[in-house]
């Protein structure tokens, strides 16, 4: 359902426009997602979520050419208890004109179902799928048969004022690149590799 809209935006060559949803749109609390429609195929962007003075994270916007066409992989889930107070939130959008019933298969064999109407957006935490209970035994998952669905996940730790996030994608590859690591001056780098298939695989990690 269309909640709000703003006037036409002109971007000059190499131009950039920042929009704060809460400032530029009416009824911002009712807005679940935004579509930027352009007469050019040379537009890119990103979304930034933040609480001033606490945490922030930036996640790329999704071009219509990269809408998922199959299973979506939830690469990492952090849902701990009081001693590990991480929360994982998932946001998904059905970009199609048909309703969808999505099954989420977790790595501990649990399954949950999420219903999406045509063009519907839903946001939920992993805990909310289990009655609000933390799920420290779940580390990853697969959203099955999710063609036409896009999404992202956010990780938060309120005690540490930490936030992170990634897109939910359907692509896999033989080789994956981690283009930057930092392990000095207090920086730490964590890398994650996830095998969503039912077959074992051998991974060779080569640092350069």
Which residues does each PLM region occupy?
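Gly/Pro-rich, tryptophan- and cysteine-flecked surface segments typical
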Residues: 1-208
């Amino acid at each position: 359902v269309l909640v709000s809209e703003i006037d036409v935006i002109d971007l000059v060559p190499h131009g950039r426009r920042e929009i704060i949803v809460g400032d530029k749109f009416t009824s911002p609390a009712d807005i679940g997602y935004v579509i930027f429609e352009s007469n050019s195929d040379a537009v890119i962007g990103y979304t930034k979520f933040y609480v001033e003075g606490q945490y922030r994270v930036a996640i790329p916007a999704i071009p219509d050419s990269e809408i998922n066409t199959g299973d979506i992989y939830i690469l990492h889930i952090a849902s701990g208890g009081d001693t590990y107070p991480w929360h994982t939130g998932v946001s998904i959008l059905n970009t199609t004109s048909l309703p969808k019933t999505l099954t989420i298969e977790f790595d501990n064999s649990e399954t949950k179902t999420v219903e999406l109407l045509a063009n519907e957006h839903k946001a939920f935490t992993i805990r909310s799928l289990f009655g609000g209970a933390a799920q420290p035994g779940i580390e990853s998952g697969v959203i099955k048969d999710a063609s036409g669905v896009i999404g992202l996940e956010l990780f938060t730790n309120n005690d540490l004022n930490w936030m992170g996030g990634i897109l939910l994608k359907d692509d896999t590859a033989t080789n994956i690149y981690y283009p930057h690591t930092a392990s000095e001056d207090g920086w730490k780098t964590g890398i994650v590799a996830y095998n969503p298939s039912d077959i074992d695989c051998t991974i060779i990690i080569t640092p350069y």
